[in-house]
Amino acid sequence: TTPQEVLSRIKDQGIKLIDLKFI
């Protein structure tokens, strides 16, 4: 896995967490 892939996964997880918090 490349650093870019790791960052993209972290961003996806972060967006999901934010969505759950605001819902």
From Swiss-Prot:
Belongs to the glutamine synthetase family. Its EC number is 6.3.1.2. Involved in nitrogen metabolism via ammonium assimilation. Catalyzes the ATP-dependent biosynthesis of glutamine from glutamate and ammonia. Its cofactor is Mg(2+). This is Glutamine synthetase. Oligomer of 12 subunits arranged in the form of two hexagons. The keyword Transmembrane helix does not apply. Keywords: ATP-binding, Cytoplasm, Ligase, Nucleotide-binding. The activity of this enzyme could be controlled by adenylation under conditions of abundant glutamine.
